[in-house]
Amino acid sequence: MRNRSILVRVPASVGNLGGAHDRAAMALDASLNLKATRKSDDRLNIRYFGENGERVPRDRTNLMARAFESALRYRGLEFSGADFEVYSTIPVGFGLGSSTAAVWAGLVSANLLYGLGLDEQTLFDLAGIFEPRSANLHAAWRGGLATCESAGSGFDRTRVSQEFGLIALVPSHASQQLSVSPASGNGESTTQFRLAAALAGYLSRPDSAKPSLGYSGPVGGSEDLSAVAETLEAAGSASLASFLCGGGPVVGFLTRSLTPESALSVQDDLIRRGLARKVWSFRPANSGAEEWNDMAVTAPAPVELGEGVELAKAAHTAA
């Protein structure tokens, strides 16, 4: 008999890394941890413990629940009830991959709890229904750095040196109009591919020449962001690149050789000086949901791929 409970863990992820839009994302050492329990009363109970947890729906509009149901419907099963208990260190709603983690947690927990036998391609097809950021999906799944370096190619995984880190912050005086525009032309797309390739090379081999990454972020608050870069340099880590994390509002600063003690000092200093409303420090995570949850051993089971995904999409649309 299958277990009635399963524990699932998924890392945070940051997209638009170095300004590469959806061509590069990196897994981070924060995580969403879900204990999912099967029930037979058709009810969903969600307990969520984590920063900004009040933003997380406690009903079947919850992203984990919707992904969970989509996996069941793919196999022609109906939702019969579940308890979700979540402990997360991923801040919700700040462009740090909380939605990506929720999608993977829902799919992985359903796959393992019900023995659905969904293979990797099917899981990605289902995940793409709920999360359009492909780079984040790949980074959170495999860990490390996910990059797409040429048109028509898939995402490659690169292990990231632990010399690197990320300081992520909500600027105190940044423009409220924060957004990342997708690449709109061949020249712009080529730039994103180049940035992705440069990131993969440098973050895996820190002794190689530092590429030109530059800045890609909000227009407002440039003086404050320059002060952040100066603070990092004073702490012994020049900012290698600064960029809007995903769709914002968080701005990320890619760092190198910043010790945990120095990172805490930087966080305190930025808050004290009024340069940021919130600050987090992260390290790369070189493992992801696949390894953490032993998904590599999940054997694919025969199914009509198109039919199953269409059923899941229909369920998502109905929700």
Can you say where each PLM-predicted feature lies in the sequence?
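Alpha/beta catalytic cores of group-transfer enzymes, especially the acyltransferase/condensing modules
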Residues: E120-F164, A229-L232, S242
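Short beta-strand-to-loop capping motifs
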Residues: R38, V170-P171, F253-S257
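Glycine-rich, charge-dense phosphate/pyrophosphate-binding loop(s)
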Residues: Y202-A319
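DPxDG-like acidic metal-binding loop motif
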Residues: A30, L96-L118, G143
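Active-site rim beta-loop-alpha module in soluble metabolic enzymes
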Residues: A168-E223
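ATP-binding N-lobe of GHMP and related small-molecule kinases
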Residues: M1-F94, L112, L116, N286-S287, ...
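Beta-strand segments within the central parallel beta-sheet cores of soluble alpha/beta enzyme folds
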Residues: Y48, G81-V86, D119-I129, P211-G214
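Short, well-ordered amphipathic alpha-helical segments that serve as non-catalytic structural scaffolds
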Residues: N62-L72, A196, T231, S265-V266
